[in-house]
């Protein structure tokens, strides 16, 4: 708690000039804490919207939507002489590679270390509570980090994701050494550095990530595939997460009940108003007829890949 009491104001980096000055400093340090915030719960084309960087002295929040050239950060991430401390690094590294083509060396993943040591609760909120008595406000966990301006509350939340990682790393390093696990941990950390960049993709026949799809008959599965393709197309055009166009539970109900007219369609629970009338409603009915009349046996395998690369939600935004 002594570390927390010394917390200074977070420094928001919003200009190229600010960033260049900070970059010069980062290149001289032996260890940094890193985290990112993205907008994957809101946008189809997910992108990193914040990069949090903590040193032993200061918490920085870098706005990649405002700072044009972040190329210099690759020198830091790829430098084996600068250790980068993440919690559950794979997702952050994958996104940073996707958006900026960064390379990584010398990573310490506190989530991997905690798992090796034997911690049962691996989420950062639980780890910080266990080690520092700190409670994270989960209100901002899934907010739209692509919206500007950022509130003071958002900045406070974001900075806590990295503020404690350096002292946490020191504690975990000692535990890894005490249990003779450091060499094994270093191998795992090196593997995390090789995580590939992941692009959002829609595999047209893949519907098995939708809970309950496996219990549908062939015709209903064909309807579900057709609706998924349509949802994906709309999501791409609007740059919205697919589950915010139509929730997975709603898609499943449509595939199960296969309404034949507007009256039956209107009764589908969870269907947004925009799909209950007009052109959108007629399009949904047409897609259901299309799927029902043309089931594809080749794509009815239980081993199908995932249809929806975004988190499911039972309450899509209208």
Region locations from a protein language model:
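Helix N-cap/beta->alpha junction signal
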Residues: 15, 88-89, 247
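Non-catalytic, usually N-terminal nucleic-acid engagement modules in DNA/RNA processing proteins
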Residues: 33, 42, 50-53
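Single-stranded nucleic-acid-binding OB-fold domains
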Residues: 38-45
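Active-site-proximal helix-loop-helix substrate-binding element of RNase H-like nuclease domains
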Residues: 52, 57-166, 170-173, 193-197
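Accessory DNA-binding and partner-docking regions appended to nucleic-acid-acting proteins
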Residues: 152, 172-318
């Amino acid at each position: 708690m002594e570390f927390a009491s010394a917390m200074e104001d977070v420094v928001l980096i919003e200009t190229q000039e600010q960033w260049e000055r900070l970059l010069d400093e980062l290149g001289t340090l032996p260890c940094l804490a890193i985290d990112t915030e993205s907008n994957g719960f809101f946008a189809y084309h997910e992108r990193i919207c914040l990069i949090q960087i903590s040193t032993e002295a200061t918490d920085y929040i870098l706005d990649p939507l405002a700072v044009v050239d972040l190329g210099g950060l690759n020198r830091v991430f790829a430098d084996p002489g600068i250790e980068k401390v993440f919690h559950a690094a794979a997702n952050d590294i994958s996104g940073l590679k996707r958006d900026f083509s960064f390379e990584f060396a010398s990573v310490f993943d506190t989530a991997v270390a905690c798992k090796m040591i034997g911690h049962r609760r691996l989420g950062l909120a639980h780890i910080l509570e266990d080690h520092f008595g700190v409670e994270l406000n989960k209100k901002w966990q899934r907010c739209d980090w692509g919206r500007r301006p950022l509130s003071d509350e958002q900045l406070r939340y974001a900075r806590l994701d990295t503020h404690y990682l350096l002292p946490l790393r020191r504690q975990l390093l000692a535990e890894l050494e005490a249990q003779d696990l450091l060499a094994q941990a270093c191998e795992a950390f090196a593997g995390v550095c090789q995580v590939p960049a992941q692009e959002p993709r829609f595999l047209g026949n893949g519907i098995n990530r939708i809970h309950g799809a496996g219990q549908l008959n062939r015709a209903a599965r064909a309807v579900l595939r057709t609706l998924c393709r349509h949802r994906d197309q709309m999501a791409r055009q609007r740059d919205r997460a697919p589950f915010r166009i139509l929730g997975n539970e709603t898609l499943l109900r449509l595939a199960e009940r296969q309404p034949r007219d507007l009256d039956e369609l209107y009764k589908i629970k969870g269907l947004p108003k925009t799909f209950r009338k007009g052109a959108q409603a007629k399009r949904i009915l047409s897609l259901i007829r299309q799927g029902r009349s043309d089931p594809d046996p080749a794509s009815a395998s239980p081993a199908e890949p995932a249809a929806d690369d975004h988190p499911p939600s039972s309450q899509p935004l209208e």
